[in-house]
Amino acid sequence: MNTLDFVDEKSLRSDVPDFRPGDTLNVHVKVIEGSKERIQVFKGVVIRRQGGGIRETFTVRKVSFGVGVERTFPVHSPNIDHIDVVTRGDVRRAKLYYLRDLRGKAAKIKEKR
């Protein structure tokens, strides 16, 4: 193990649920506005998960008022309050970039039984 791995190990979160691309998540993010802090929920489909260790990130996509919105979060970020898995998706790809081009029912992901 490298020296950096020992340093990174202290920053890893233990409360991260098991999720994969295709799953629908509620990501509760801490937002600081002035001197106030509040929790904002970002609900969407995981389209990718990449990296490893402290550098691991995932991207969540949702359609808000007809506009596609994607947000990339570090898995072990202190700005994430917690992550809820809403549904499990049944997909055959690790990166779901093709969802960007689909509209309506075509962009729907089958739920895993």
UniProtKB/Swiss-Prot annotation:
**Coiled coil where?**
none
* Entry's Gene Ontology molecular function annotations: structural constituent of ribosome
Q: Report keywords, A-Z.
A: Ribonucleoprotein, Ribosomal protein
BP GO annotations: translation
Write down the InterPro entries for this protein, in alphabetical order.
Ribosomal_bL19, Ribosomal_bL19_CS, Ribosomal_bL19_sf, Translation_prot_SH3-like_sf
- Which cellular component terms (GO) are annotated to the entry? cytosolic large ribosomal subunit
Keyword Transmembrane helix included in the entry's annotation:
no
Q: Which family does it belong to?
A: Belongs to the bacterial ribosomal protein bL19 family.
Function according to Swiss-Prot or TrEMBL: This protein is located at the 30S-50S ribosomal subunit interface and may play a role in the structure and function of the aminoacyl-tRNA binding site.
- State the protein's name: Large ribosomal subunit protein bL19
What organism does this protein naturally occur in? Nocardia farcinica (strain IFM 10152)
